[in-house]
UniProtKB/Swiss-Prot annotation:
<feature type="region of interest" description="Disordered">
    <location>
        <begin position="17"/>
        <end position="39"/>
    </location>
</feature>
<feature type="compositionally biased region" description="Gly residues">
    <location>
        <begin position="21"/>
        <end position="35"/>
    </location>
</feature>
<comment type="function">
    <text>Thought to be a regulatory component of the ATP-synthesizing complex in the mitochondria.</text>
</comment>
<comment type="similarity">
    <text>Belongs to the ATPase inhibitor family.</text>
</comment>
<feature type="coiled-coil region">
    <location>
        <begin position="45"/>
        <end position="109"/>
    </location>
</feature>
<protein>
    <recommendedName>
        <fullName>ATPase inhibitor mai-2, mitochondrial</fullName>
    </recommendedName>
</protein>
<keyword id="KW-0496">Mitochondrion</keyword>
<dbReference type="GO" id="GO:0005739">
    <property type="term" value="C:mitochondrion"/>
</dbReference>
<keyword id="KW-0809">Transit peptide</keyword>
<dbReference type="Pfam" id="PF04568">
    <property type="entry name" value="IATP"/>
</dbReference>
<keyword id="KW-0175">Coiled coil</keyword>
<dbReference type="InterPro" id="IPR007648">
    <property type="entry name" value="ATPase_inhibitor_mt"/>
</dbReference>
<dbReference type="GO" id="GO:0042030">
    <property type="term" value="F:ATPase inhibitor activity"/>
</dbReference>
<feature type="region of interest" description="Disordered">
    <location>
        <begin position="73"/>
        <end position="95"/>
    </location>
</feature>
Amino acid sequence: MLSVSRVASRMTGVVARFSTGGHGDGAGRGGGSGGSIRDAGGAFGKMEAAREDEYFYKKQKAQLEELRKHIQQEVDHHKSQLENHQKVLDRHQKRISEIEAEERALGKE
């Protein structure tokens, strides 16, 4: 079994090899394998890489917004439930007070 440090040292070389060049720089320069335009590199490859990055940025932003809305709905629902439970709790405590008052009145007779 490989230790963490051995795996990390082996991965360092792999990361260094794949991180040369930028997105869209072309095959063999760190930006290829994204389609024929990106494989060619140059301005079109970089432009296509930028479009892909923008697409995924917008997609992630939309997903986060949807998640935020869903969580806000959950918060609103639980606040509503809390208010309902508080009303029921108050009603029960009032009824207990009334019963205790009746018990005291019966005890005095």
